[in-house]
């Protein structure tokens, strides 16, 4: 595995290796000194063309805990705002000797194009409405930590599937790991190609809820919409929002997930978001461990050299 561009590029064994490595590395976050020397001397560039809070900070924390040098690049205030192309930015990073580039971009496929232009490792942190593979990995990790497994789980992904890179990556990864995925959304918020996805589709949240082990809520991405996809926010929430009444109909062991950012009162109520069934804050915590594992494996960590001092313990 040279890059991480798509959840669909991962084999089952590769995905499990990342999850297992993340579990070992999670112990670092519990130490008083949260550092490993594994990536000392390596340079990781966070190349973010879209706004981000959780993902950018998570990757920065992950790289720094592995002792890498981190450069944060924002399109605002850079040559990009003056019209510089992605390719020219890539060539600049190449000339500076970046070992790894974490990219978020509004254009689907941007990460794959970048990988053609640089020698270093490229990690896709979200490319438009296409994919977000590390989010899917941290979601799978969270499921495994809470429920003990991923294989055989019934996972409902609810909301704006059409504009969600998280949904696409989760469908690809979770089915690779043996989960059964059902997408729940109004027809207008499903992608045209959804019939080619390896999952089921439902328009009825109340029918799917009692059968699900995991319910993953997605926000409506109004910033990507140029027309109306549903009658009103109130009507959407009535049919597809997760509130306390719907939570009570879920199986006792079932968990509620959300990749963030949440719109409380629309796709999820504050009561549900703050409940013991919610894994929202755990997902953020787990994201650092998973991204540490991805950086560790892709940038030549000691996992290939047993006995090295950088090996997770």
Curated annotation (Swiss-Prot):
UniProt: carbamoyl phosphate binding residues: 54-55, 104, 132, 135, 260-261
Pfam families: OTCace, OTCace_N
Keywords (A to Z) from UniProt: Pyrimidine biosynthesis, Transferase
EC number of the protein: 2.1.3.2
Molecular function GO labels: amino acid binding; aspartate carbamoyltransferase activity
Cysteines engaged in disulfide bonds, as pairs: none
Similarity comment: Belongs to the aspartate/ornithine carbamoyltransferase superfamily. ATCase family.
NCBIfam families found in the cross-reference section: asp_carb_tr (TIGR00670), PRK00856.1 (NF002032)
Subunit structure: Heterododecamer (2C3:3R2) of six catalytic PyrB chains organized as two trimers (C3), and six regulatory PyrI chains organized as three dimers (R2).
Protein name: Aspartate carbamoyltransferase catalytic subunit
